[in-house]
Design a protein with these regions (language model features):
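Active-/binding-site microenvironments in catalytic and ligand-binding cores
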Residues: 6-319
Length: 319
């Protein structure tokens, strides 16, 4: 049975967090100039093995539509301005000119609505990012290291593993605020005869969007189902490449008042692990259940924006 919503006393101990941070650190593991962090765990064989998971040749987007509407989950709707190019810019004779249109986008994608990837430079601690790089914006108004462009050079292709909590628990959704611990993951592995391993993209479905459909909005910054920060130890031991969730992977509340996104900090700063937030995993869940599967080929390629702390993203499952 999954852990209840109540936190044990030790969850609030900052000392546990600090000790774990030191224990799991990947700083220097792949060299002092490494820019990829746990993406180094994805080998050629990981990609080749992921191909074998394509049985039906079907694809599913794991992204939500980017919303233009403000709501309690979306504090920053995308601003989208379409335009038609003036005729005099499309040909020497405006009467015979081609017709074309374009767009201007403005988006603040970090938050609780837009599906996005957190690049490794999204979080710092004491002025340092993963591998000791300075957590600072340079004179060119960009981070010099660990930007999403580094992830975009190779993209992310590997085996995807879906921990589908509602299916495992036999419910429509897992109540917001439920904490998932290492022992819960291992119970899921045992039941499904799957071992999460090196190079995997580990996705957690909580049923967030189904809870929204049935019960409406709630204050997500105070209650969100996700991993307890100690799961970072599991991610390190298993050499997981990337984590993602229909929430933000972190459980809210984290149990540490000064660390709202405790797992985010451990994953990004200590492990050097990119994170996928606000995914739509519902259709994937239905199709994998139909096939009695939990794994698939995962593909994602973020925008290559120099030094950016992440980007909107449209991951794809191929099965």
């Amino acid at each position: 049975i999954f852990s209840e919503n109540l936190f044990s006393k030790e969850l609030s101990e900052r000392e546990n967090f600090d000790n774990l941070s030191k224990e799991i650190s990947n700083w220097g593991r792949w060299g002092v100039n490494d820019q990829l962090g746990t993406l180094n765990n994805i080998s050629d064989s990981n990609i080749m093995n992921a191909k074998t998971l394509v049985i039906e040749g079907k694809t599913i987007s794991l992204s939500r539509n980017i919303s233009k509407e403000s709501n309690p989950f979306n504090h920053a709707p995308i601003k989208h301005v379409p335009f038609i190019f003036p005729a005099d810019t499309m040909g020497a004779d405006p009467k015979l000119a081609q017709e074309a249109a374009g767009d201007i986008f403005e988006i603040e994608y970090h938050g609780y609505s837009h599906t996005h990837i957190d690049a490794i430079n999204h979080f710092g601690r004491n002025g340092k990012m993963y591998n000791g790089f300075p957590f600072e914006i340079n004179s060119n108004n960009e981070f010099e290291n660990l930007g999403v462009d580094e992830i975009g050079k190779l993209g992310i292709i590997s085996r995807g593993v879906l921990i589908d909590l509602p299916v495992f628990f036999g419910v429509d959704y897992v109540e917001a605020g439920t904490v998932i611990r290492i022992e819960d993951i291992k119970r899921w592995e045992k039941k499904n005869n799957i071992k999460i391993g090196k190079g995997d993209v580990l996705l957690l479905r909580t049923g967030r969007w189904e809870q929204l459909r049935q019960k409406g909005y709630w204050e997500i910054t105070k209650k969100s189902t996700g991993f307890h920060y100690s799961v970072a130890s599991f991610l390190k031991k298993r050499d997981v490449a990337v984590i993602g969730c229909d929430g933000v992977s972190d459980v809210y509340p984290s149990g540490i008042k000064s660390k709202k996104d405790a797992l985010h900090e451990l994953a990004l700063v200590d492990l050097g692990m990119p994170i996928l937030d606000n995914m739509d995993l519902d259709l994937l869940s239905k199709n994998l259940e139909r096939l009695n599967r939990k794994t698939f080929m995962f593909v994602a390629n973020p925008l290559k924006i120099k030094g950016a702390t992440g980007a909107p993203i449209n991951p794809v499952a191929i099965y």
